[in-house]
Amino acid sequence: MAWRNPTSARQTPLYERSWVAMVALVAIFLAANFQLLTGEATEHWDGEQFFAPFFSYLASVVRSGHWLLWNPFSNAGSPDFVEPQIGALSPITLGFAAIAGPSAVAFRLYWLCLWLFGGIGMFVYARSLGAPVWGRFLAGLSFVFSGFYIGHGQHLSVIHSISFLPWIILRLDRALLTGRRAPALEAGALLGLSALAGNPAITISTGLFAGAYSAVRFFSSRASTIAGQVRPALETFALFGFVTAVVLSPTYFSFKYETVGYSDRSGPLTRECVVSSNGMQPVGLAAIVNPYGPGISRANAKDPRSPEVMSATYFGAAPLALAVLALALPGRRRWKWGMFFVGLLFLGFTLGTALPLRGWLYDLVPPTRYFRHPNMFRVFFIFSIIVLAVLASGKIEHWRRLGDAPEGVLRRFAIISAGLAALGISVITAFCFHYPRLGPYIETAVPHAVVVWLGLAAIAAGVSWRPAWLAHLPGALVVLTVGDLLCAHYLSADLAFNIGIGEPARSETKRSPVELGPENFARALVVGGNQQLFANKPVYCSYAALLNSLHMDSAEAGTLMAFATGEKRVWFSTDAVEAPVTAETLALLTKEGAARKAPVMLRHRRGTLLGETPPPPFNAEAIHNAPSAERVPFEVLTYRPNELSMKVECPEDGWVLITDRWSRSWRATVNGAETPIAGGNLFFRLLPVQAGENLIEMNFEPFLLWPLLTTSWTLLGLIGITAGLRAWQRAANRPPPPAPKLSTPPVPCGACS
């Protein structure tokens, strides 16, 4: 006989309280990553060479009371405020950097806080879907310990973007279901806020996923409900998109505006590059059921940073089984299958060249032409499957409280679990027989796969055999998933960080990041790992996102780089030959410079650099016959990131080449008269001068930055304050919980039917 569990007749047990589950989620996450805080584990790859140095530099600039706009230390100068992955215009990144400072511990704490923010968001979103406490816990745990977080743990901007995903969908879903405008505003503000310091690929993809999610909500809702009506749905999504565009505008408008003539990234990438660069291969789908697939791929790859390493997709055995069970259950079929097919669609984008989907997306959605790495789309598959698992947890909790489940449901769960167990064990077996090198953790990976998958099958079979054990199913799944994901984290942690090799080297300095002074005008050649950002030392070429392929080629050739480094890097010539900015020009310029031991002066009109006027024809004879440039006496008066002034002594009228990078927002005066800055020698600043002493003053003045930033932050503040006030009012008006009733004996289900 089934017995009803009278939960209303007693106080909620401690383990069924939401705050306890939340604390447990945070504690497990911190315990799994505690080595990052103690220094036993450190960032590596892009984390060590890009994100940590730039966070430290940004913190130093902010603490000095300035904005990071122009970075004079990297690549002979760079407009780094436009690079969203640095977060120079994000209130979150700036606030944390200002408070925590430029230390390595501060960077790792920021990293972990962002990472954990995603797990907490998934927990809260699962609650909005009606999940029980244990379902929320599983959702948060499986998301924050998923292979996507591990595979991209080195990429701080990716972690930043994806951790906002559940919060964005939470508020967007609320807006779609209620027709209220406030949640739509909040969803747009969250996506825009994430974009200010996030990865552009994830930002754009999140917008696509939000659109697909909204469509599923619309088509799976009855026409009598608000979510099923066309006009409210369109208004909600339009408001969401408008707020997003306003909030992210300081970074994204500036990126599109400032990078023209400076970086190759100002325009779309080629279709071939987008589709073929770091897409997941079909064999990578095995990572859905086994976390060690990327580890074995890494052990057998020539490059440890190969695309296979970034294909980690595992998020737990139990959540996957629950998701498949959700599809097999009656009720809300359009909603569940809609989410499933959206997940499959984004998984198809992940496969890159294996399917035509990513290419079609390139053709149909222009913003997707600006980023590569198709494997990043897999996070939306993970998210969709976890949503299905959340829905199944709600059903199981309902049956648990009733004391019984509909006939055949538990048998289905047992069959699903057994099938997935067979698949999971087959995958690890195939790994062992296929790959010659199995990696350092195979002795843990094999028992992990066997115990987890057979354990899941045994739990499901036991509940199917004895339905009375249904009351213990949530606890068993929670214990299994905690052990499963902690072991998976152990197997894959070295994809995200180094363990046990000590702190990476830092070229610390007492130099100011904003007051360079004449003594720091000298420029070095190349510094590995962006160490110049720790040392505040200008370099000609460094690792950065705002790439210019010709500039990188010039660094490899060496000749042009030699003329733009050292202390005496200001040149004069009576003539500057007009030439196009092409690889052919670079090759001839390098050849002439090597032969003459001095540069030839080339000029590039502003309109040509901006693509407003056609480039001049390449004239090799004119370049060959041009006079050699010469060094002239100069005195640096002011040298700051956004300001450079100097006196230059010129023998006659002509042109002065200052070997700091050209960018369209630099303004100049020569002897007090405003003078347009032309491009010189492909990358640098060229100014007309007169015979005698010339006072040259240059300032970096980004176009529309301050109006856009003021509007963005003001809108963020208004939406945030309004949301906070509403939350406070709801909490103040919430009725007190009812007094606990006296406990009563269990009542047979039949007596109440």
What is the predicted role of each segment?
Residues 3-6, 156-163, 175-188, 192, ...:
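Contiguous transmembrane helix-bundle modules in multi-pass membrane proteins
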Residues 14, 348, 614-742:
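Active-site-proximal, structured, solvent-exposed surfaces of multi-pass membrane proteins
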Residues 17-48, 53, 240-257, 345-348, ...:
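Transmembrane signal-anchor helices characteristic of membrane glycosylation enzymes that use polyprenol
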Residues 19, 28-122, 141-163, 260, ...:
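Membrane-interface coil-to-helix junctions
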Residues 51-62, 66-67, 91, 246-327, ...:
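Periplasmic/ER-lumenal interhelical loops and adjacent helix-loop junctions
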Residues 99, 145, 149, 153, ...:
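Transmembrane helix irregularities
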Residues 123-144, 181-182:
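Transmembrane-helix signature of polytopic, membrane-embedded enzymes
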Residues 292-293, 300-307, 311, 322, ...:
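Soluble catalytic regions of membrane-associated enzymes that act on cell-envelope
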